[in-house]
Amino acid sequence: MPLWLQGVVELGSVAVVSYLLILLTVLMVWLADGFDSLGLTGGFVLSGQVWLLAHLTPLQVALDPGAGLPATTGTVNLVPLGLTLVPFVLAWHAGRRLARACWEGQFWQPYLSGLAVYSAAGAVAALLFGTGEIAAGPAAAAVFPLVPVALGAFVGAYRASRSLPGLIGVNAAAWVERTSQYSRWAGSYVWAVLRAGFVAAVAGVGAGAALLAAALLWNWNDVVNVYQRLGTGVPGDTALTGLQLGYLPNLAVYALAWATGAGFEVGEGTHTSPLGTQTGPVPLLPALAALPPGELPSWSAAVLVLPVLAGVLAGWWFLREGENHLDDWMAIRLPARWITFPLSTLLTGLFIGAVAGVLAMLLSWLAQGSLGLGRLTVIGPEGPDVLLWFGAEVAVGAAVGCVVGPWLEREPPFAPLRGGASGEDPGDGSGAHLGRAGRREARRRRRAEAAARRAMRSAGPAGGAGSSAVARPAQGRGVADAEAPEPVGAFDVDAPAAPSEVRGSPER
């Protein structure tokens, strides 16, 4: 099968399967008399509208006053992120299969052809499932669904191939090798800061999810009372629970925003945060029964420590990476450690906090939105507020994590080396018995050996094909199945040891 056609089949299947999963859920509720006046055709239309909303496509709402409701026009763009994960995960697996079927540098062929078909499917869905009350613009439906699918397919392909040169045919490592030593240190430092910020964001979302679970358990009686007051029966309760599960990731992001101090809104005039709550009428949904009361206890401000702890975890992770080349560079330029160490630690904390704040702001923008009706036009946190609050708290925690990180390690900084001063690992190869200095020396030696192997392949008779990061597959093997070189970390090159490796660990 041609690669472009395989991309069409794979991503076209993602569109069909994701729609069928939503349709199955709607039909189950319909068969249980959950939608009295919907009808079978209405079930297909409602499933298509939910499919578009799950793909980040805004829906235009225009209620007819003849249906017993006040005339209202608005935009529904409160995306159920739980349903957005469905096409993302399906595209992840499709990207893995496409990566295994491609030669080096050919992934863009099935990738672009599949995305073109997915864009056309979104435009067709907008035309088929639009009604007089709810509709989506064909142009928006052709663009927005590409976001979760393109991201999922690319991430899945990268996870399968573990090589950007194998996917796009551009060897960034070869370009980095031609730069100066300071440029290589800067690249390694920036890459480590980006990953540390991602660690802080993931830890923050996890803390928000734990806070949401604790709030639901604490207010479980109120949640059950709302179900009983609604009196929708088993079919209605099932549909309502499914709706809330679709918005569960949104609620976790709201809990994160609440823990940072930025807070969030549930309609115009209703804002809640640990520093104060402005009460107002809220929709009668069971999950909203876990909202904090108007009068908060004095200890509620203690939740502000959760983002700080996420920053401490990110700072500790950054320290364990051993890529603090900003501190190395400052130590070379200015020998006064009582100045360079606090300054580099503060700057690193600020950089990690900025990355984590930007990621949290993006999550807030995805989780917030409008239902287009009445007061429910503003739901969720404000992205800039989350950026400032979460970024500042993570920055403080990351600086603390970089300082206390050495005391969190199990082995002392100057543990005796059984393998001698060279840092060799004479044991089982795990390096668990080596001290920090020994592990750094062993890591430097492995990097040098990997660089030497790359140089030998570049000088071999195979020419340019032997110097690529992923060799051309033999006997029908794809990019993901080809034997890749030993991973040596981002921006690893044949370079002299960093100053931190020469000086050893600082004294406690």
Which role does the model predict for each range below?
Residues 1-85, 128-129, 225-308, 365-508:
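Long, glycine/tryptophan/cysteine-rich extracytoplasmic
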Residues 1-229, 234-238, 407-416:
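N-terminal membrane-targeting/anchoring modules of bacterial envelope and secretion proteins
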Residues 105-168, 213, 217, 312-425:
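Alpha-helical transmembrane segments of multi-pass integral membrane proteins
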Residues 134-138, 142, 146, 187, ...:
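Generic hydrophobic-segment detector
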